[in-house]
């Protein structure tokens, strides 16, 4: 009889621990929603006279498809970087073809 009661006590402790673990996992998922977890990158030649695909568009998005695109254009005079904000997978500013491709890759399309 004591053995059965001990097992029930252990079972109650395990159930309580499992519930605490579920709550902690839920907290972790909530925190993850705002972290960048989707990435798309496209390397390209911005100018025909430049080779090596030194320019790139990089899209970084969170779980809700919010984030940004960095476009880095490499030329013989220097390297220029531009950013565009992404909200719910959309950009208020027109995207170049490489930027749109990077966004599409990040969104899994």
Residue map of PLM features:
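Polybasic/polar functional segments that serve as interface/processing modules
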Residues: 1-56, 61-109
